[in-house]
């Protein structure tokens, strides 16, 4: 009996065991069985913790906000990039959050980092530790939606971490003269006391302004202030602090350690005697607040203040902080942490990593009065710290020279809001260690004396003007904790930033110079910003390759003016005609596309329009061109014109446009709707003969360059481009919109629907949805007509996508839909993005990057995955019993590492230097053409197969399902672990990679065995006749 070919064989049936099937009946399974099922597949922590995760010596990142590239891109795309963004108003350093998230969504991580560091020199630190829920995130407009606010801190951290990996130095503002040619005032000696966030920020901005004799004095042998000594490694790694300090040192700032503010060392008086013209005090609050009940208690007895405890933990957990290796502080038994601020929660979670069995966080007020940010509170709760509110410490009980317990009294709030202690309600809590985290003060008399003669306020802190950060001594400024205004790292950074401008103003005044009334601090610069992205085309010089397409962004000339002011290099006017062909538009006429699915807001992948050409007259546009060229001589203005197939009309209109001063013309031969019915636009652009003749007419009429705008709504676009070239065109624009019908509602009516009759017509589809069509048009023209200029348009929404068109043979790039999604300011992102892409091509150490995307390392939730397979010989999924086993293995490994005596060398930062010439825009034009050809030129003997990274796999089975129902049934799916395995029947089709939700979890690698296609039945052998 012949086999049944249309039935799966037994081996395939086995593979298909877990493949989805349509449901035909209800499913029955007992509650007990479901409880067991739930336990097996559970990924989040069990609320009944009988055997909590062991965290001793585990200083791995625990932040919920941390993102990998996938998470960062999705979150950035979700951001609305609002007008007058409230998030920015809530950021102490005034970060342009809208702009840096725009850059992240466009995979321009350098552009994002540049925006961040321009306003915050400690942008990576703040991305990690900022209490964003109380700052920028608190103002996010998406709080008004179901999905909630944007993870701004995580995005900030991701972008700046990618820049950190680029290993590129900060440079002086390129517009400044060399240091030796700067005015004398910029050589003034400036001293900063304390190497914490406020001083690093202040010194960075002063150096960016051009000052070249800046010294920071730090009393410790390490730098970074509390970022180094008190914020734990699992929240803020030391290499991050060191990186930002190195960026500051790139500008020539000097740091001298082991020098303290004290009558026995440095004083304001000695600084003045040594010739310092200005000083900044950023020493923080170095002494702990200590309740009288702790007098006489020592660390040997089990008592620590946060100022004792956290630095001890830091020295043993922060690699590179100091050359010596300090063993991790060992704590056993029960720990009581007193306080409800961020520091108290840092102490609690750090105590667990020092070996504490249980940690109680005890505070005087209730949960609603906890001062710590929600992020810290949630982390402590997840790590099973216990919270005890409404208790005030009364007494420490010591036996045998060790703390054994603490006595508390109950606190209550009366009707007036005053908190009182109730001595009748006493609680006693057994404990082995007590950590007091009641805050910090400035109490050392030697330090205060060293600050003489500045005045102190009623809180015994230096008195400063909160606007200028100036003390009672005009040459002395202060910021950060020591002033008592800043409560967070980011606020301390802003104090230093604020002070830098007024130090600048003060110093300049001492040298008889003045500064602008409005503060103007320089941006952050690197060698990337020096990359030249200008390009020449048809004897026209473009400052960058990005311009406005003849479309909605050029509805009026005033809009073009604003675009030029923003940085766009060129613009095409909205297409205009002779007055006899003037149009009136219908409405509605521009709608969102359906190609993005149910995604609302910006980031649309397509738009459809049934808008005609400009409703404004030729006279308006000609005068506008004249005005724009007068005010923006370095910008290119291209007049976009349209006529019917009439020689006289084309010659008349093109001469008018040339006379207006336009640099070039674009002949719109491609409008896909409306105009074609008038014998214009598409009606002219689909016939090579008509195109050739129109171009000949225009060539006879004008001397300036002109370009024919082509339609993609043809069978052979090359024949149209060739006709334009033969007619004398200097190049072509490829392509205009694709004719389409975007959608029909459930009742059958279209959208857009015009008038009472709800009628519509086929419109022009634009946006990233048509990019494949536009790329094909550009590359086919470039291959057929080498060196023939192409103005690309069609889905260009980033520097990365723009580079694709340049590689495809385009010379300059026109943008429309991306502006409809956002605004004119995206040009800043495009320029920095293209500069970065070109610069990184010259760095040999980054050749495994894809543009600005680093090579993907195995990770889960954006955090590195421990190599479990190396420890136990096999890979395990991250859920249920396997996750618990992973945690146990990691805990054992951390304990093993704790016992090793590891010597850590100081961190060194050696910048990546370009080993190859940085390519120009001209150098990359057409680079991809060598890879394009016919199907017959492809090699079918060099095959690939899929390989799945099981450590990154999230076990969704998408690869398995698409392979089953759309491919070759070549992936097995384990019923217990849900780990997919690619079999040797893989054909390398790449569908699995295409639907995988995790970047680089699946990779295609070269096949090592010969590929033998499955023919179903053997090939018939026909005899030779």
Curated annotation (Swiss-Prot):
Q: Which residues bind [4Fe-4S] cluster 1?
A: 79, 82, 87, 140
UniProt catalytic activity = 5,6-dihydrouracil + NADP(+) = uracil + NADPH + H(+); 5,6-dihydrothymine + NADP(+) = thymine + NADPH + H(+)
Record-annotated 4Fe-4S ferredoxin-type domain positions: 69-100, 944-976, 978-1007
Please provide the record's keywords in A-Z order: 4Fe-4S, Acetylation, Cytoplasm, FAD, Flavoprotein, FMN, Iron, Iron-sulfur, Metal-binding, NADP, Nucleotide-binding, Oxidoreductase, Repeat
Q: Name one GO biological process term.
A: uracil catabolic process
Cofactor binding note:
Binds 2 FAD. Binds 2 FMN.
Q: Residues that bind substrate, according to the entry?
A: 609, 668-670, 736-737
Residue sites binding FMN per the record: 550, 574-575, 709, 767, 793-795, 816-817
Q: Which cofactor does it need?
A: FAD; FMN; [4Fe-4S] cluster
Q: How does it assemble?
A: Homodimer.
What's this protein's name? Dihydropyrimidine dehydrogenase [NADP(+)]
Q: Which organism is it from?
A: Bos taurus (Bovine)
Q: Which gene encodes it?
A: DPYD
């Amino acid at each position: 009996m012949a086999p049944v070919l249309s039935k799966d064989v037994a081996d395939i049936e086995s593979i298909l065991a877990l493949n989805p099937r349509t449901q035909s009946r209800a499913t029955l399974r007992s509650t007990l069985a479901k409880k067991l099922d739930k336990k097996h597949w559970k990924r989040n922590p069990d609320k009944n913790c009988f055997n909590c995760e062991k965290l001793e010596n585990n200083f791995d990142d625990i932040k919920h906000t941390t993102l990998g590239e996938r998470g960062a891109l999705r979150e950035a795309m979700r951001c609305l990039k609002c007008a007058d963004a409230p998030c920015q108003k809530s950021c102490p350093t005034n970060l342009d959050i809208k702009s840096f998230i725009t850059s992240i969504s466009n995979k321009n991580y350098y552009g994002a980092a540049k925006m961040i560091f321009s306003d915050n020199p400690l942008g990576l630190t703040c991305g990690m530790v900022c209490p964003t829920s109380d700052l920028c995130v608190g103002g996010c407009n998406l709080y008004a939606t179901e999905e909630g606010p944007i993870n701004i801190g995580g995005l900030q951290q991701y972008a700046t971490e990618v820049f950190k990996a680029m290993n590129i130095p900060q440079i002086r503002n390129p517009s400044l003269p060399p240091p030796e040619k700067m005015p004398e005032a910029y050589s003034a000696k400036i001293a900063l006391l304390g190497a914490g966030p406020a001083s690093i920020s202040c010194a960075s901005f002063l150096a960016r302004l051009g000052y070249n004799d800046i010294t920071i004095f730090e009393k410790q042998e390490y730098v970074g202030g509390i970022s180094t000594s008190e914020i734990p490694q699992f929240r803020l790694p030391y290499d991050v602090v060191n990186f930002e300090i190195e960026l500051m040192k790139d500008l020539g700032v000097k740091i001298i350690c082991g020098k303290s503010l004290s009558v026995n060392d440095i004083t304001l008086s000695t600084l003045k005697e040594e010739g310092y013209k200005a000083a900044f005090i950023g020493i923080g609050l170095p002494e702990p607040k200590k309740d009288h009940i702790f007098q006489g208690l020592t660390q040997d007895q089990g008592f620590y203040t946060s100022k004792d405890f956290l630095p001890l933990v830091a020295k043993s957990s922060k690699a590179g902080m100091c050359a010596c290796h300090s063993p991790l502080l060992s704590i056993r038994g029960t720990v009581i942490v007193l306080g409800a601020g961020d520091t108290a929660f840092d102490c609690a979670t750090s105590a667990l990593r020092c070996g504490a069995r249980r940690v109680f966080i005890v505070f005087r007020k209730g949960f609603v009065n906890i001062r710590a940010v929600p992020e810290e509170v949630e982390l402590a709760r997840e790590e099973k710290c216990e919270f005890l509110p409404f208790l005030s410490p009364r007494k420490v009980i010591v036996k045998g020279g060790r703390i054994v317990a603490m006595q508390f009294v109950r606190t209550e709030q009366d009707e007036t809001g005053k908190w009182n202690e109730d001595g009748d309600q006493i609680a006693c809590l057994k404990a082995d260690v007590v950590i007091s985290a009641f805050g910090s003060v400035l109490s050392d008399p030697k330090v205060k004396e060293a600050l003489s003669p500045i005045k102190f306020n009623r809180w015994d802190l230096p008195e400063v003007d909160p606007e200028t950060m100036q003390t009672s001594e005009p040459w002395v400024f202060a910021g950060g904790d020591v002033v008592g205004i800043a409560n967070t790292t980011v606020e301390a950074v802003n104090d230093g930033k604020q002070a830098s401008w007024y130090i600048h103003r003060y110093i300049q005044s001492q040298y008889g110079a003045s500064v602008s009334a409005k503060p103007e601090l320089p941006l952050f610069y690197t060698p990337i910003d020096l990359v030249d992205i200008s390009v020449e085309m048809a004897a026209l010089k473009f400052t960058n390759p990005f311009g406005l397409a003849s479309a909605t962004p050029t509805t009026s000339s005033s809009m073009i003016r604003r675009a030029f002011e923003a940085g766009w290099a060129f613009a095409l006017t909205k297409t205009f005609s002779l007055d006899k062909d003037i149009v009136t538009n219908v409405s509605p006429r521009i709608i969102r596309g359906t190609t993005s699915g149910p995604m609302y807001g910006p980031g649309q992948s397509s738009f459809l329009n049934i808008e005609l050409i400009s409703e404004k007259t030729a006279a308006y546009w000609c005068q506008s061109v004249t005005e724009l060229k007068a005010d923006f001589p370095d910008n290119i203005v291209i007049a976009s014109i349209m006529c019917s197939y009439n020689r006289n009309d084309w010659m008349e209109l093109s001469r008018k446009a040339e006379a207006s001063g336009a640099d070039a013309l674009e002949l719109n031969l491609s409008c896909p709707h409306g105009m074609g019915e008038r014998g214009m636009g598409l009606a002219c652009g689909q016939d090579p003969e008509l195109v050739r003749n129109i171009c000949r007419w225009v060539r006879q009429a004008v001397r300036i360059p002109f370009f024919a705008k082509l339609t993609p709504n043809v069978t052979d676009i090359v024949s149209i481009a060739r006709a334009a070239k033969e007619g004398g065109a200097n190049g072509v624009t490829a392509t205009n919109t694709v004719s389409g019908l975007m959608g029909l509602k459930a009742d059958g009516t279209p959208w857009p629907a015009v008038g009472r009759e709800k009628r519509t017509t086929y419109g022009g589809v634009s946006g990233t949805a048509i990019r494949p069509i536009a790329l094909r048009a550009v590359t086919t023209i470039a291959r057929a007509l080498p060196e023939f200029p192409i103005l690309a348009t069609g889905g260009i929404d980033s520097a990365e996508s723009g580079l694709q068109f340049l590689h495809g043979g385009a010379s300059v790039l026109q943008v429309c839909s991306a502006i409809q999604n956002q605004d004119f300011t995206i040009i800043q992102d495009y320029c920095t993005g293209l500069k970065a892409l070109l610069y990184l091509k010259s760095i040999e150490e980054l050749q495994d990057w894809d543009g600005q995307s680093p090579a993907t390392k195995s990770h889960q939730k954006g955090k590195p995955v421990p190599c479990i397979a190396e420890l136990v010989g096999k890979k395990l999924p991250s859920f249920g019993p396997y996750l618990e086993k992973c945690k146990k293995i990691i805990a054992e490994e951390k304990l093993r590492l704790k016992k090793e005596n590891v010597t850590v060398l100081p961190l060194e930062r050696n910048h990546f230097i370009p080993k190859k010439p940085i390519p120009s825009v001209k150098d990359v034009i057409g680079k991809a053409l060598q890879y394009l050809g016919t199907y017959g030129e492809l090699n079918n003997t060099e095959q690939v197969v899929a390989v799945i990274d099981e450590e990154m796999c999230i076990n969704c089975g998408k690869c398995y399902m698409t392979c089953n129902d759309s491919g070759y049934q070549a992936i097995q799916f384990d019923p217990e672990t849900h780990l997919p395995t690619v079999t040797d029947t893989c054909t390398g089709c790449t569908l699995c990679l295409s639907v995988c939700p995790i970047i680089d979890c699946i990779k295609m690698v070269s096949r090592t065995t010969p590929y033998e296609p499955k023919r179903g039945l053997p090939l018939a052998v026909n005899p030779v006749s």
